[in-house]
Amino acid sequence: AEIYAVLERETGIGRQEGMQAELAAEGRYCFANPYMLQMTEAVRKYGKRMIVTSDMYLREEDIRRILEKAGYGKFDAYYISNEYRCSKHEGKLYERVREKEGAGRRYVHVGDNLGSDVEQAKKHGFAAVYYENVNTAGMPFRPEDMSAIAWIV
């Protein structure tokens, strides 16, 4: 992936070494969000087709492996921005989904980014459900400035 070429240049860590280290860490530390896991299990019970869309630089096979290891099981299709050379952020990935999955279908997109997952999904005819991510949800509980603590250490 192109990102590892930049990281190699900036850090001196070889592309393959960096990629393998990241994938190992992803495999070790990624786990299923219990609420999203419950939702995917419920959707599967209804027999609905479920696809993954992601603005991510990892390969589809890596994302597939991470999700399966985390307990989500297999999805029906994967649309990963770096493989389609377009993104949810710009809206083009939603167009690819419609082209491949069928323009006449109804889609519900669940995501944690208001711009990419909600606004762009709606612009492209998808129903959209916002799932607040942990960083946004935790923001009110984080101090604005922790620099005073640095003087204690």
Go through the PLM ranges and name each one.
Residues E2-V52:
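Short, acidic loop-to-helix structural element flanking the phosphoryl-transfer center
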Residues T11, G27-P34, E61, A70, ...:
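A generic "structured core" feature
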Residues M39, Y84-K88, T136-G138:
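A short acidic, often aromatic-flanked loop/helix-cap motif at beta-alpha or helix-coil junctions
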Residues R44-I51, M56-N82:
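Substrate-recognition/cap helix-loop segment adjacent to the acidic, metal-dependent catalytic center
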Residues I80, Y84-S87, G115:
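Catalytic cores of eukaryotic secretory-pathway lumenal/extracellular enzymes that build
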Residues H89-G115:
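Conserved Lys-Pro-Asp/Glu-containing loop-to-beta segment of HAD-superfamily phosphomonoesterases
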Residues V108-V110, G115-P143:
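Acidic, Mg2+-coordinating phosphoryl-transfer loop and its flanking beta/alpha structural elements
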Residues R142-V153:
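Charged, amphipathic alpha-helical linkers/stalks
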